[in-house]
């Protein structure tokens, strides 16, 4: 039970990453679990890959479709096997968000200019969200994902503000649905990879309170980091407490359920104006480790 069981009724939510690990936990498993409110698909790992298109690294998908191959976009994946599951999730009111980035050993989401940032926002808009260019290349066909999550861990935020503004402008073009833009910065405050001027424009920020020593959950600097992040992103942006669902992958800072519940209660007691809930990395390890949250 790695997440708080109380308080969800008052609007506190649980987001979870899925796709980067072993696929024995399916997207349907995650979407059908009432504990989870939002799924982050991990990952769109490279902004510029074969043919100038992005590269996807979603674990249980195969290679590119015929149309993608023909266009030279061989870093894209044929996501048709996930379409039904994504629709299932969305039908339950659970947004499915494309997370872009990940650990730097496996990704490259560095930008060298504002123009590149705007270009990526347009490319991703067309391939995954409400855009209509490159229809034949869309990994999930006519399914529109619900937004993007910025998981830049390069320590270089160049172009991210321009990209974020372009995403938000694109979102306005499709009034048929609500789109979200979020980020997952590291807990040392502030984070160069996800600059504050970017975070202040987002719907929520799910801070990784792990892999970072002093500001990890239950460490000495945790409370101060939470307060700094809450204030820095502004009261209009929700703050989620990011936690590991297991210590199995060599990640550092995993805490047992009771400790995480204590930490979340500690945050609740701060009465922050923008506390939104918790985030878990990662769905497969949560199941494997028996770390699913308690039901309300």
Swiss-Prot record:
- Which parts form a coiled-coil structure per UniProt? none
Q: Which GO terms describe its cellular component?
A: extracellular region
Pfam annotation, one family: Glyco_hydro_18
Phenotype when the gene is knocked out: Leads to decreased endochitinase and exochitinase activities following heat-shock treatment.
Per the record's keyword annotation, is Cytoplasm included, yes or no?
A: no
Catalytic residues identified in the record: 153
Give the positions annotated as glycosylation sites. 32, 152, 228
Source organism (scientific name): Metarhizium anisopliae (Entomophthora anisopliae)
Q: Which reaction does it catalyse?
A: Random endo-hydrolysis of N-acetyl-beta-D-glucosaminide (1->4)-beta-linkages in chitin and chitodextrins
Activity profile over pH: Optimum pH is 4.5-5.0.
Top-level taxon: Eukaryota
Output the SUPFAM superfamilies linked to this UniProt entry: (Trans)glycosidases (SSF51445)
Please explain the role this protein plays, according to its UniProt record.
Secreted chitinase involved in the degradation of chitin, a component of the cell walls of fungi and exoskeletal elements of some animals (including worms and arthropods). Participates in the infection process and directly acts in the penetration process of the host cuticle. Involved in heat-shock adaptation.
Q: What is this protein called?
A: Endochitinase 3
Induction, per UniProt: Induced by chitin and cuticle and repressed by glucose. Protein expression is increased after host tick Boophilus microplus infection. Also accumulates in response to heat-shock stress conditions.
Q: Where in the cell is it found?
A: Secreted
Domain GH18 positions: 12-296
